[in-house]
Amino acid sequence: MGMQQRVEILKMLYRDNEILIFDEPTAVLTESEAEKFLECIRSVADSGIAVIFISHRLDEVMKLADDVVILRDGQLVFKEKTKNTNKNEIAEMMVGRKLEADSMINVNRQFKDDYILEVKNFRVNMPGEKTKDVSFKVRRGEIFGIGGLAGHGKTSISNGIFGMYPSSGSVLYNGEELNYKKTGEALNKGMAFVSEDRKGVGLLLDESIAMNMVYTDMKVNRNFLKKFGFFSQFDEKTSDEKAEEMIKELYIRCTGPDQIVGRLSGGNQQKVCMARALLSKPKLLFVSEPTRGIDIGAKQVLLNYLVKINKELGITIVMTSSELNELHSVCDRIAIIGQGTVQGILKPDSPNVDFALLMSGEGGENHD
């Protein structure tokens, strides 16, 4: 996806335009790739082309923009010269409340060598994100992060385990070989997946919030169905009640459980994806790019919720993200993927230089 986005960006830059509008152009790019792109946009603006840059990434806004405006709930709530404001003020205006500073929540948690997931010599043929030889183990009860540059294979791992792309190698779940080539096997075994492609894979855009939330649990576990002998019928009342519960728990902004998902904002759609995964009561949850393209308030809600369900429900989580700071803030360990393989596994409080070296392919001290 990152490479496709860059191609689209280049096509726009080569047209003879007086104004360019970019809507979340770096959402699928890593931090280093986004930085190079911002330099390009700055050069375009310096040449006399006006740029409207729409982004939830505050670092990018502060670095690139001359002026900043904030829309919240469809209204203009803030307008200022960038040099006269700061990230904290912008963030608070975006969400309408003060935000807590990021911190490393899970530093120095201890786990036994009880592995819920063991991946060995795993290869996934996912276009633009192939892995060549991935091996790692995930301890029961931890939040395991997967990071790396776009195009190096990090997002293909969860997709391969859930049978989305041709794969080979060994995947052990609770000590037993997982037949990941069989569609739906991971779901049947008690895993769940929140895809990075929420519109293409994660949601039924023309269906209601309630239907989207209960769909997987209904199909896999036969819940939310009224049974009449050999026949069954969708239990709309029960599904609406459960959807109402999840709407409140995840602070989903909507008109109710009957609202069509395609009409929700990106952040609220992502919360529906999260609710859908959790209603199947997984023991192991994979989340891929959970905060891509959503506002800072929704990001905080989702990240806090991941930590909450990990600690309160004991759900083991594998989180793939291009945002290293997010991995730092919630993960117990972080694997860096480069050139289709695991370059190293680090603790979240490991020196930044070690993360940088692993991402550059130069290697770093392993603090696992």
Regions found by a protein language model. Name each.
Residues 1-368:
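Glycine-rich phosphate-binding loops of nucleotide-dependent enzymes
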